[in-house]
Structure formats: C-alpha cells, structure tokens
A protein has these predicted regions:
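PAPS-dependent sulfotransferase catalytic core
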Residues: 1-87, 102-112, 116-154, 176
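Generic structural signal for well-ordered alpha-helices
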Residues: 67-71, 97, 169
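Phosphate-binding beta-loop-alpha motif at adenosine-nucleotide cofactor sites
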Residues: 83-89, 155-199
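Short N-terminal helix/helix-N-cap motif within the alpha/beta-hydrolase-1
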Residues: 92-95, 121, 194
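Residues immediately flanking
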Residues: 114-116, 186, 210
Length: 213
C-alpha cells in the first residue's frame, strides 16, 4: 500500500493550488490526481475507516471511506522520492495533524499563509462565486460567522476563524516539529514562485528544480 510522505495542509486561498501544480511538474514528485482528497480531516476508527456522523455538515463529505481506498490515489507512483496531496482544510480541521502522524508517521507538512484579512475576503468571494454564500455583504458574513459555526455550517464559511493561524500552526509544530513542517507566505509565492518551489523541494529531499534531476 503506497501512502504519501508529505502534505500541503493549507491555508485555503493562499496559493496551495499553484504550489500543487508546480510540484506536480517535478519528475521526483508524485501528486495525487485528486488535489483535495479531504480524507484526514475526518474522524477514523482504529482500522482507518472514516466515522460517518450525520451532524457533521461543516465537513466535506468523505471521498474515501477507509485508508485502503485513500491509498489508491498513490498506486500510480513509480519510485518518486516525494509523494503528496494538497487539502488546505487540513491545517484548520481539529485532529488532522494527529491522524496524519498516526497513519503516515514521519510525513512532512507544507503550509502557505496569507494575510488573514485578504485571505478571508478572497474566501468570501469564492463562496459567493460558486453560489454557496447566500450573503453579498462581507461584513455581514463576518458578523454572522459565530452563529454559523455554532450551527455547524461548512468550514468554507469560517472566513475569520480560518485566518487564526497561531493555534493551527501550534498543533502542527507540536506533532511534526520544525524539521518536518515548512511554512511559506502567499506573497512570496506570488513574487517568486520558482524560489518557493525550490525551497519546498529541499524540504522534500528532492533536487532543487526539474532541470537538475
């Protein structure tokens, strides 16, 4: 059973899609064909089976019901040094870091962070664009966020809360340590995507760029 050895865990609207595509071009990197599997954000039993809960409307419905199904995402890997996936909800969903470490011990995590206000507004515009957000006023959506969270609205509506990076990073540092957790900024990704990608390649123990492999 082939499993990933690294994860792009967030944050949403912070450049994770661009980084996914950059990494996917590297011959020593295999990325899951589904960019966002939404697997480790779900609770699992002792056998790696997703625990379904009817009240969890705030979570993305599971694409895979157990660890064996999830591993099929990586069965086409052919000796690449780095095997990964990118689900930006992972940094925010409670318990995800611990589940990754339990089922994929020693894996590395990559985080992209964006100015929280810019990130929140970008997430709001995205939710409006796809028809998920019923409001058109961002300020009103922020005012209603605490009530939405209490009513277990989907994580996509947690605009302000998903930008509270301290607690999110704290969990990952506690689980992964500094040696297995890399943090970059969205602004750096925009200004120098190749430079950020090269530093990520170094974290993943690959050569700096495709032409060097």
């Amino acid at each position: 059973m082939t499993m990933p050895n690294f994860f792009i865990v967030g944050a949403q609207k912070a450049g994770t899609t661009s980084l996914y595509h950059y990494l996917n071009q590297h011959p020593q990197v295999y990325m899951s064909p589904i960019k966002e599997p939404f697997f480790f954000d779900h609770e699992m039993d002792s056998k790696g089976r997703v625990v379904r809960r009817e009240f969890e409307g705030h979570r993305q419905p599971p694409r895979f019901t157990n660890i064996e199904e999830y591993s099929t995402l990586f069965e086409a890997a052919r000796g690449e040094k780095a095997i990964g996936e990118a689900t930006p909800l992972y940094i925010y969903a409670p318990g995800t870091a611990e589940r990754i470490e339990r089922y994929v011990p020693g894996a590395k995590s990559i985080v992209l962070l964006r100015n929280p206000a810019d990130r929140a507004y970008s997430a709001f515009l995205y939710a409006v664009r796809i028809g998920a957000e019923p409001l058109t006023d961002f300020a009103q959506a922020l005012r209603e966020e605490p009530l939405r969270i209490r009513n277990r609205w989907h994580y996509i509506f947690h605009y302000r809360s998903r930008g509270l990076y301290y607690q999110q990073l704290k969990r990952y540092y506690e689980v992964f340590g500094r040696e297995r957790l890399g943090v970059w900024l969205y602004e750096d990704m925009r200004e120098d995507p190749a430079g950020v990608a090269q530093s990520v390649f170094c974290l993943l123990y690959t050569s700096p760029s495709p032409r060097d492999s």
